[in-house]
Amino acid sequence: SIGKLGIEEKNKTRRGTLGLDLESLRTIRNYFKKINRLPTDVEIETLAQTWSEHCKHKIFSGKIDNIKEGIFKKYIKGATTKIIKKRKDKFCVSLFTDNAGGIEFNKDWLVCHKVETHNTPSALDPFGGSITGIVGVNRDCLGFGKGAKPIANTYAYYLAFADKDYKLFRQKNNQDPMLPANYIANGVISGVRVGGNCSGIPTPQGTIYFDDRFAGKPLVFCGTVGLIPRKIKGKLSHKKKANPGDSI
């Protein structure tokens, strides 16, 4: 019940779902048995957040019948690695290891780019889903290497037609209706605008595509481009490590 209902408080109320399946809960239990102590509530909720499908992509990276290594390792990471090996110019300096990917812009600068989707959050709360999407990738450029400067945002929205009245529901018996298409469109667009432009990062590029198939869930891509000097104080800027005593 802890996976569905969350941690129980002293007054017997629950904090809300952790979204952890039985296998994940057993893994957490076995680890803390091994180190001979109980987990704190913060540790449990941290694991629930970082192991979520939204953050960890357990389904996307999981093994499937005819692709044992999973879709991500075979078709994204694997394909990228093959292409890079064939090229003579080794311009990719950081891939699949940091908060964003980084390539050489010229001999003095690196450019980094991070794009992520915020589909389900935007279906439930269009403004909140898209603003957390864009500021999240702003953060990822800031977190690249020793800290890149975000210089531009990008977006791609795949939405249902805003002038149509779709009758869709999340639950059986016409319970929990989907938000109206025009409400989703306005909220998604406003979220990226406020998250980027109002913090001083321009949004010069984007695309919008409309189709009935996105009435159940919009596709909301948010992206940020950043710049960072090739070297900082004589050291490669994409190289970093955490040291004891560092501030967070």
What are these regions (language model features)?
Residues S1-I248:
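Core nucleic-acid recognition elements
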